[in-house]
Swiss-Prot record:
The keyword Ribosomal protein applies. It comes from the Eukaryota. The keyword Ribonucleoprotein applies. Gene3D superfamilies: 4.10.860.130, S15/NS1, RNA-binding (1.10.287.10). One of its GO terms (cellular component) is cytosolic small ribosomal subunit. GO terms for molecular function: small ribosomal subunit rRNA binding; structural constituent of ribosome. Belongs to the universal ribosomal protein uS15 family. GO terms for biological process: translation. This is Small ribosomal subunit protein uS15. PANTHER family: RIBOSOMAL PROTEIN S15P/S13E, SMALL RIBOSOMAL SUBUNIT PROTEIN US15. Pfam families: Ribosomal_S13_N, Ribosomal_S15. Keywords: Cytoplasm, Ribonucleoprotein, Ribosomal protein. Its main location: cytoplasm.
Amino acid sequence: MGRMHAPGKGLSQSALPFRRSVPTWLKLTSDDVKEQIFKLAKKGLTPSQIGVILRDSHGVAQVRFVTGNKILRILKSKGLAPDLPEDLYHLIKKAVAVRKHLERNRKDKDAKFRLILVESRIHRLARYYKTKRVLAPNWKYESSTASALVA
């Protein structure tokens, strides 16, 4: 996928395996994988962190092939999904970090410019999630309350 605020075209991407069946050497069942997902979500991990742990520690390459559903959909069915979508959360976290940096370094013009770019991405993503009804229609990003969102 191409970059929004950079010249790179971003042509490289990871390739999914052609076979969509569960490997024969995997001994975990669908229920075992779901229990692991619930346990990791209760620890406060994000869906992508859960996927990395399942891949690296338990040998589950794709949760969707084993369970039939994606991690976020499994979490939503149990009511464990995060309030904010993960990509929006990380953008807000980045904006808070840049703003904190700007408090210490007032003359950093490049950081000020990057903050504008990050916040414009936040507004664009928030508009998308409002149309998809993931966020409430009255949800609004404000820099003053952003640190409370990611704390």
